[in-house]
Swiss-Prot record:
CDD domains from the UniProt entry: HATPase_MutL-MLH-PMS-like, MutL_Trans_MutL
Function noted in UniProt: This protein is involved in the repair of mismatches in DNA. It is required for dam-dependent methyl-directed DNA mismatch repair. May act as a 'molecular matchmaker', a protein that promotes the formation of a stable complex between two or more DNA-binding proteins in an ATP-dependent manner without itself being part of a final effector complex.
Record keywords, A-Z: DNA damage, DNA repair
Descriptive protein name: DNA mismatch repair protein MutL
Family under the similarity heading: Belongs to the DNA mismatch repair MutL/HexB family.
Biased composition annotated in UniProt, kind: Gly residues: 382-392
Source organism (scientific name): Salmonella gallinarum (strain 287/91 / NCTC 13346)
Length: 618
């Protein structure tokens, strides 16, 4: 058989094999088109489980007459126009395949009118070449799609359809999922002329609770724990059922949405299951309704024919974020149980801490960098301080079990800061001849050394060594402990018996250094670290610190601070002039003894006299 171009109808029927699995698939695609059109009311009429009729009517923006024929063509869409649009898609549909595919396996009629048009127009495709016919019609502003005799021309597909009741149950489930995703839209579902479901648009929390109860049932509502969790561009909200009271009936309630799109994602399910594993039996599953919002550039929705799955660019970050959000609400279950009217508003923001594995590279700053980043802590007499990031609008969540009262007070103190941190106070440049000044930075040599001029002499200063001394000063407690910075996602590590014993022995000293942890039989969970360690890869640093402690017989805060200062990774592989000047200003302020008596390896005088002599000519 020679190579040939397939007829349009056959090509669309092949595509329909992926897009149109059953009547519920048709309903999903068409209702999502209505939502993309801005509809606030969608009526779904079904006959004989969708095999005879599927009618979707909405009050959206409608389709212009000249675009009706294109709407039924393959790969024609108003959702995207370039690859950039595809990589940051926010609409539910975008491929332009649904209407063409559905039209190829049914008798489809599209009727629409825009607000600018005086009359409506109707379009339908027929024949081998799928020629589109357009004619006038009567219709209000919006769109109606009628799908008659689904799979009438593909008997093999029609043979695999289930009973009328089964197919309608699948449609009912799709509408339930959409109703949970869009509380602001009225959805009416009818079957064989009878109204079966009516979900009115709601806005208030109490009304949302009633819709949640209508869809998921009263037992779920009674056990639901509200979640509101945020970190950078990630937001998690919704409800999870208390695992201690989860029944077999509740385990069927597993609804997850990514940027408003219904999902069945294994990564998300695994994170939720892992957070609940200590409270669930071997044969139990968590029950949840969760909404994940993420930067559209960081998620690929074009990885599944039916768009049931997505791929996250930073999957580990998303997994740990969801895990910690669910785990935190389970630990606070006595305070956050529904009904919603009886609980305090959930916090809109949480402190922006970095995850243990590193920084969030795609977080978009909400304000200028100088205002967003916490200022360098001011130290007086060796005592440390500093603030811990953005303010939580609703305050820090209730202390997790195992935390002591004073630890909760530290958390609250960290959050009682302005929503926008004040800009760091400018550090006055050091004056030449000052008794506590290294001098003036002339240039950077070799990427990690600063060439200094002071009192007529030239010296070379090692910036990594100066940074290490500064870290040690920042980590050494004075009259009060170093301020701890809570981690958004605590670091959980498996430890040996010797390592656990060493940690317990050094726990009070580590607390003075701002390192807070909890331990159980075989694991230790790092809950907070001092500010200088916020940007470090804690998954490497903390195990090395535990190994160091296990080898020691006695402990001292100075020795531990020295070890940490030597083993932290520099944030500046290549130093700039501005970074060097800022570092020296901090060192002069916090470590004045280094100016008076520089330790070995910090400063090296440069003898220019011999070089100058060589340049002199008789």
């Amino acid at each position: 058989m020679p190579i040939q171009v397939l007829p349009p109808q056959l090509a669309n029927q092949i595509a329909a094999g992926e897009v149109v699995e059953r009547p519920a698939s048709v309903v999903k695609e068409l209702v999502e088109n209505s939502l993309d059109a801005g509809a606030t009311r969608v009526d779904i009429d079904i006959e004989r489980g969708g095999a005879k009729l599927i009618r979707i009517r909405d009050n959206g923006c409608g389709i212009k007459k000249e675009e009706l024929a294109l709407a039924l063509a393959r790969h024609a869409t108003s959702k995207i126009a370039s690859l950039d649009d595809l990589e940051a898609i926010i609409s539910l549909g975008f491929r332009g395949e649904a209407l063409a595919s559905i039209s190829s396996v049914s008798r489809l009629t599209l009727t629409s009118r825009t607000a600018e048009q005086a009359e409506a127009w109707q379009a339908y495709a027929e024949g081998r070449d799928m020629d589109v016919t357009v004619k006038p019609a009567a219709h209000p502003v919006g769109t109606t799609l009628e799908v008659l005799d689904l799979f009438y021309n593909t008997p093999a597909r029609r043979k695999f359809m289930r009973t009328e009741k089964t197919e309608f149950n699948h449609i009912d489930e799709i509408i339930r999922r959409i109703a949970l995703a869009r509380f602001d839209v009225t959805l009416n579902l009818s079957h064989n002329g009878k109204l079966v479901r009516q979900y009115r648009a709601v806005a208030k929390d109490g009304q949302k609770e009633r819709r949640l109860g209508a869809i998921c049932g009263t037992p779920f509502l009674e056990q639901a724990l509200a979640i509101e969790w945020q970190h950078g561009d990630l937001t998690l909200r919704g409800w999870v059922a208390d695992p201690n009271h989860t029944t077999t009936a509740l385990t069927e309630i597993q609804y997850c949405y990514v940027n408003g799109r219904m999902m069945r994602d294994r990564l998300i399910n695994h994170a939720i299951r892992q957070a609940c594993e200590d409270k669930l039996g071997a044969d139990q599953q968590p029950a949840f309704v969760l909404y994940l919002e993420i930067d559209p550039h960081q998620v690929d929705v074009n990885v599944h024919p039916a768009k049931h799955e997505v791929r996250f660019h930073q999957s580990r970050l998303v997994h740990d974020f969801i895990y910690q959000g669910v785990l935190s609400v389970l630990q606070q279950q006595t305070e956050t149980t529904l009904p919603l009217e009886e609980i305090a508003p959930a916090p809109r923001h949480v402190p922006e801490n970095r995850i243990a594995a590193g920084r969030n590279h795609f977080a978009v700053p909400a304000e200028p960098t100088a205002a967003r980043e916490p200022a360098t802590p001011r130290y007086s007499g060796g005592a440390s301080g500093g603030n811990g990031g953005r303010q939580s609008a609703g305050g820090w969540p209730h202390a997790q079990p195992g935390y002591q009262k004073q630890q909760g007070e530290v958390y609250r103190a960290l959050l009682q800061t302005p929503a926008t941190s004040p800009a760091p106070e400018p550090v006055a440049p050091a004056l030449d001849g000052h008794s506590q000044s290294f001098g003036r930075v002339l240039t950077i040599v070799g990427g990690d050394c600063a060439l200094l001029e002071h009192a007529g002499t030239i010296q070379l200063l090692s910036l990594p060594v100066a940074e290490r001394w500064l870290r040690q000063a920042q980590l050494t407690p004075g009259q009060s402990p170093v301020c701890a910075q809570p981690l958004l996602i605590p670091l959980r590590l498996k430890v040996s018996a010797d390592e656990k014993a060493a940690l317990q022995k050094a726990q009070s000293l580590l607390g003075e250094l701002g390192i807070e942890f909890q331990s159980d039989a075989q694991h230790v969970t790092i809950r907070a670290v001092p500010l200088p360690l916020r940007q470090q890869n804690l998954q490497i640093l903390i195990p090395e610190l535990i190994g160091y402690l296990a080898q020691q017989t006695t402990f001292a805060t100075v020795n531990i601070a020295q070890w940490i200062a030597r083993n932290v990774q520099s944030e500046h592989p290549q130093w700039s002039m501005a970074q060097a000047i800022s570092l020296l200003a901090d060192v002069e302020r916090l470590c004045p003894q280094l100016v008076k008596a520089p330790p070995g390896g910090l400063l090296q005088p440069v003898d220019l006299h011999s070089a100058m002599s060589a340049l002199k000519h008789e």
